Amino acid sequence: MALRLVADFDLGKDVLPWLRAQRAVSEASGAGSGGADVLENDYESLHVLNVERNGNIIYTYKDDKGNVVFGLYDCQTRQNELLYTFEKDLQVFSCSVNSERTLLAASLVQSTKEGKRNELQPGSKCLTLLVEIHPVNNVKVLKAVDSYIWVQFLYPHIESHPLPENHLLLISEEKYIEQFRIHVAQEDGNRVVIKNSGHLPRDRIAEDFVWAQWDMSEQRLYYIDLKKSRSILKCIQFYADESYNLMFEVPLDISLSNSGFKLVNFGCDYHQYRDKFSKHLTLCVFTNHTGSLCVCYSPKCASWGQITYSVFYIHKGHSKTFTTSLENVGSHMTKGITFLNLDYYVAVYLPGHFFHLLNVQHPDLICHNLFLTGNNEMIDMLPHCPLQSLSGSLVLDCCSGKLYRALLSQSSLLQLLQNTCLDCEKMAALHCALYCGQGAQFLEAQIIQWISENVSACHSFDLIQEFIIASSYWSVYSETSNMDKLLPHSSVLTWNTEIPGITLVTEDIALPLMKVLSFKGYWEKLNSNLEYVKYAKPHFHYNNSVVRREWHNLISEEKTGKRRSAAYVRNILDNAVKVISNLEARNLGPRLTPLLQEEDSHQRLLMGLMVSELKDHFLRHLQGVEKKKIEQMVLDYISKLLDLICHIVETNWRKHNLHSWVLHFNSRGSAAEFAVFHIMTRILEATNSLFLPLPPGFHTLHTILGVQCLPLHNLLHCIDSGVLLLTETAVIRLMKDLDNTEKNEKLKFSIIVRLPPLIGQKICRLWDHPMSSNIISRNHVTRLLQNYKKQPRNSMINKSSFSVEFLPLNYFIEILTDIESSNQALYPFEGHDNVDAEFVEEAALKHTAMLLGL
């Protein structure tokens, strides 16, 4: 299944064997009561109560006398510890232990079993206790009221230096939250006692709320109160120095007026109380380290024919409401859907019906979310019991007493990528898999292998393009928290294709009103995201439009011989050298193909320009990041782009078992060579539309394969349309490898006339042939006549200078001779100092004779 649950804790394996061993030791010493093992007969009494910030798990069970026993499982030492035994037959529904394990707070209610006498005072439904447990000593009653009370100790960040004051939250069913400040002191050695236990200072930090959630990892309290029928979400941050702040408030377009009272993550939502307080509404807040803030909401279902839920992407300034149709709805249904925090994604699922993965960081396009519905084995394998999403990726199954770490399964996502027929699922699975791997070479190799075999599998987007952009993005994503705003993570800008079975409505929402002036850590990142939503018009995403314009200018200047300062061009080419050096340092093994082994000045210019522009882009928007780090990020990003292209070519080269002799023009191309030519053509299409650089040598290899695999008319069409780019290296090899048969002469001539002038001048010297001389002559004449100004001249021709009685040719040669001898003459034809009017005359006669067959 796409969601992989890795068990970190299991009551049945990590606690129950220890309890049995303790019971066996007790009975062996004669302290036990003997008889049947109560734990075997009353296993339901053992359940998880709470998971604290440090990962320790508090559980409870009834001993053979009906007493309430509290235990703790240390996640670091993987050892169990008995905390406290309360000698009354009551039911525990909330418990918390401070970080030093010196104080225990618990709320108990009357047992629901028939025949049990009432252990509580008349008029009291809930008893809340504070117990000294190091060692067990005094017990203080904090509350004895006719409403439920939940308890939660605050955990400071610095656990190595215990604070003299402990803070305890009490959350009341009567819709208020209090914070108790508990001073402790050590007496008689290590004995810890509560100071002034008769009067514990307390603050009321929230009231009149209808919903609250505790974030144990970040020590945050989220709650919603109703103001004029509006649901206002607020957040309180607790700090290690014992202070707290109201961080923000934001209105939510949801109705909670008739939803009752709901708490999330204040201990385990044990099924007995879950049913009482949920009323089928699901609401939770998820955050991650990038500064995201999502509110997931599912109202009570009016009809089981379809499910509707909303996600408020508060850090993006909009909400999305998803409606999914259910198939094969039976009478037996789970009471609500489950939301799970998977860091970069939010999982939404209803066992047996659907499983959705929502992209938190890039929610704009629906195709970047994964929607699995209907009879899918990836859905059927999900747990059918309700799961409780704790902080981070921790997930608690209250029914079984198991604590999981929820992860996305790379293998399942790859399998989905390979097997699904829908473009939207391919897109989402590709992004999910790359997020899981984040640069893992094995994963990338598997994806490249699949793309090579299915390069035309998608009609809505270019697979190669999407893979290169997404994988390059993830290679540098972790370097800075703002990378998602600066680099594109996808090549797709719009998506208009409907997702089967999904209806989506997107709405703008109000941004939070921040209540503090200075921010650190997560809050700084969230505030940065909100500022980006307010002011980033247009978006900051890098694109190659400036590089495209500058590159075309440089190429144009090169053709006209008017290139700007040598220092500017040299700096650009130095950038390209740095990229290639960085790439080669990351890949020490030999390459199968002749990529990165030639100059290819045009690609190096493009590469260097991209380095320069991307570095400027980062420097503008990454304030406070060292320039050296930014330069390295730029080199890593562009190196990754080029490396992926090399990897795709080499994967196909290896797959088809090609060798170095393929690079010589000695035979027609094979099916294997054509397959590599085809994939290189697709790479070229993918990079051209995004104007991305190619590894030097790519065009040479592509052209060589094209010459060998394509008929002449197809080859020339590819050259004329820009699919094949003639390079000096490729043409020189062609001139040297091919003899002057009629077929090869036709090919050579067709190639030479299509060469850029600068390359053509060099190539013509390598071919001792009338055609070559003719081309050289044409170019020479063109240069001479460019600035020729007609002047009065003697109409008499000195015939003694010419050996041929052909007046047009004689007249033309005389003009060339005059130009060469006058001040109008241009610089000599580059590389051909012996090219003059006499050479032109001789070339013209040879070419004419060849055409006439003389």
UniProtKB/Swiss-Prot annotation:
The keyword Iron does not apply. GO terms for biological process: positive regulation of amyloid-beta formation; regulation of proteolysis. It is found in: Golgi apparatus, trans-Golgi network. GO terms for molecular function: amyloid-beta binding. Coiled coil: none annotated. Keywords: Golgi apparatus. Pfam families: GSAP-16. Disulfide bonds: none annotated. Belongs to the GSAP family. The gamma-secretase regulator activity is specifically inhibited by imatinib (also known as STI571 or Gleevec), an anticancer drug that selectively decreases amyloid-beta protein production. Imatinib binds PION/GSAP and acts by preventing PION/GSAP interaction with the gamma-secretase substrate, CTF-alpha. Regulator of gamma-secretase activity, which specifically activates the production of amyloid-beta protein (amyloid-beta protein 40 and amyloid-beta protein 42), without affecting the cleavage of other gamma-secretase targets such has Notch. The gamma-secretase complex is an endoprotease complex that catalyzes the intramembrane cleavage of integral membrane proteins such as Notch receptors and APP (amyloid-beta precursor protein). PANTHER family: GAMMA-SECRETASE-ACTIVATING PROTEIN (PTHR13630:SF1). Interacts with APP; specifically interacts with the CTF-alpha product of APP. Interacts with the gamma-secretase complex. This is Gamma-secretase-activating protein. It comes from Homo sapiens. The lineage of its organism: Eukaryota, Metazoa, Chordata, Craniata, Vertebrata.
